[in-house]
């Protein structure tokens, strides 16, 4: 689960991570009041007005601007709120701005990158620091790997002081700046672990000319599987920033990711779902979604899955690919029949069922009187999907 920058900073601040003073605003008047308060309290010559969306690249897209007065902050807010911000991460459709973060300006000396995430290749958390602050870390790793330091963290011992010092030394910091950076990195790691985050990224981490070390931007992603331990964080979810189909699917405990193809997929199991999408692509089609109905698929979840798939107007055919291990194929078949009759499926539906009660399921489909295309194996299913698309 992703959250906004200002929400992430509020959480990090509780763990001792230094962040600039900021106030969230939902209207131009609130932005003016926030700026006035910051000018009076902080004595900064400028404030920064930042669009709050779940995407990076806001600065280049005009979503981060300086204001030298409360009135200027209000005018910037008028322009930003309700506008659609298009960045390299939003796609061409962009994201609408509904809230702003008004923040004190910083007297920046240097910018760095600090991030913590899980390295799945080693099954360990990894601390990453770079001297190239403000840039995409993937680009830095590819083009200038010598400017990126990765430190593997032993899960039994956690981040050690010498590792935090190694990171600060790599950034070329000395004296008070060095000590502040070490404190910052340790606090960030403690926050990352305590809140069960999957990513804690500070880009940029800034060092001011006064020696302060602060998170100028913060991106926090939560591990969705651990949210049951942090139910208060669920209140931070902004569904307006998410795909509406994915939000609807989550209500039925369906794992759904929308893609830009024309073949709807309904599968049980993430591995089988990815293999199914690969086969569709190889056969000449394009998957329209990733939809995993899970191991406990019921007629109701299958019906809900069809509704979500059909809400995508780009879908021209549907492939149901179920391997009945935990789930019984006859229950899935019942859901397909129920959905077809209730919703009125008017698209080609190719069905491949293997495993527990597959014969019973196939008989149910054959006797349903519905126009469902049976497939024998994954290759055959993908081929029949392509034939259905070609036919029209």
Curated annotation (Swiss-Prot):
Binding site for substrate: 268, 325-327
The entry's keywords: ATP-binding, Ligase, Magnesium, Metal-binding, Nucleotide-binding, Tricarboxylic acid cycle
Required cofactor(s): Mg(2+)
EC code: 6.2.1.5
Gene name per UniProt: sucC
Assembly, per entry: Heterotetramer of two alpha and two beta subunits.
Summary of the function given for this chain in its UniProt record: Succinyl-CoA synthetase functions in the citric acid cycle (TCA), coupling the hydrolysis of succinyl-CoA to the synthesis of either ATP or GTP and thus represents the only step of substrate-level phosphorylation in the TCA. The beta subunit provides nucleotide specificity of the enzyme and binds the substrate succinate, while the binding sites for coenzyme A and phosphate are found in the alpha subunit.
Binding locations of Mg(2+): 203, 217
Pfam families found in the cross-reference section: ATP-grasp_2 (PF08442), Ligase_CoA (PF00549)
GO MF, any single term: magnesium ion binding
Pathway membership: Carbohydrate metabolism; tricarboxylic acid cycle; succinate from succinyl-CoA (ligase route): step 1/1
Entry GO CC: cytosol; succinate-CoA ligase complex
Residues the entry annotates as binding ATP: 50, 57-59, 103, 106, 111
Cofactor note: Binds 1 Mg(2+) ion per subunit.
Top EC class of this enzyme: ligase
Name under which the protein is recorded: Succinate--CoA ligase [ADP-forming] subunit beta
Family the UniProt entry places it in: Belongs to the succinate/malate CoA ligase beta subunit family.
Catalysed reactions listed for this entry: succinate + ATP + CoA = succinyl-CoA + ADP + phosphate; GTP + succinate + CoA = succinyl-CoA + GDP + phosphate
UniProt GO BP: succinyl-CoA metabolic process; tricarboxylic acid cycle
HAMAP family from the UniProt entry: Succ_CoA_beta (MF_00558)
UniProt domain ATP-grasp: residue ranges: 9-248
């Amino acid at each position: 689960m992703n959250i906004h920058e200002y929400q992430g900073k509020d959480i990090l601040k509780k763990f001792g991570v230094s962040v600039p003073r900021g106030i969230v605003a939902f209207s131009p008047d609130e932005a003016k009041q926030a700026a006035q308060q910051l000018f009076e309290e902080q004595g900064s010559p400028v404030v920064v007005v930042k669009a709050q969306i779940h995407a990076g690249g806001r600065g280049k897209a005009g979503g981060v601007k300086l204001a030298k007065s409360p009135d200027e902050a209000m005018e910037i807010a008028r322009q930003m709120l309700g506008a659609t911000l298009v960045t390299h991460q939003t796609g061409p459709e962009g994201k609408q701005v509904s809230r702003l973060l008004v923040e004190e300006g910083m007297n920046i000396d240097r910018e760095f990158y600090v991030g913590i995430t899980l390295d799945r290749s080693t099954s360990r958390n990894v601390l990453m620091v770079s001297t190239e602050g403000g840039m995409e870390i993937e680009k830095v790793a590819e083009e200038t790997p010598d400017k990126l330091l990765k430190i593997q963290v032993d899960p039994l011992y956690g981040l050690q002081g010498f590792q935090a010092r190694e990171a600060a030394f790599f950034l070329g910091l000395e004296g008070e700046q060095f000590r502040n950076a070490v404190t910052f990195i340790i606090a960030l790691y403690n926050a990352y672990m305590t809140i069960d985050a999957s990513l804690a990224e500070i880009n940029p981490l800034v060092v001011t000319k006064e020696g302060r070390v602060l998170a100028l931007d913060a991106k926090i992603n939560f591990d969705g599987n651990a949210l049951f331990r942090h139910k208060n964080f669920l209140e931070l979810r902004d569904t307006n920033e998410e795909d509406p189909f994915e939000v609807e699917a989550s209500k039925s405990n369906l794992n759904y990711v929308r893609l830009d193809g024309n073949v709807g997929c309904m599968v049980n199991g993430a591995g089988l779902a990815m293999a199914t999408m690969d086969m569709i692509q190889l056969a000449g089609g394009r998957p329209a979604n990733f939809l995993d109905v899970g191991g406990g698929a019921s007629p109701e979840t299958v019906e809900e899955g069809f509704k979500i798939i059909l809400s995508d107007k780009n879908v021209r055919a549907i492939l149901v690919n179920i391997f009945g291990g935990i789930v019984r194929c006859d229950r899935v078949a019942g859901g397909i029949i129920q959905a077809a009759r209730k919703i009125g499926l008017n698209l080609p539906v190719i069905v491949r069922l293997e495993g527990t009660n597959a014969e019973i399921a196939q008989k149910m489909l054959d006797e349903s009187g519905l126009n469902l295309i049976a497939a024998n194996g994954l290759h055959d299913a993908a081929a029949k999907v392509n034939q259905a698309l070609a036919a029209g």
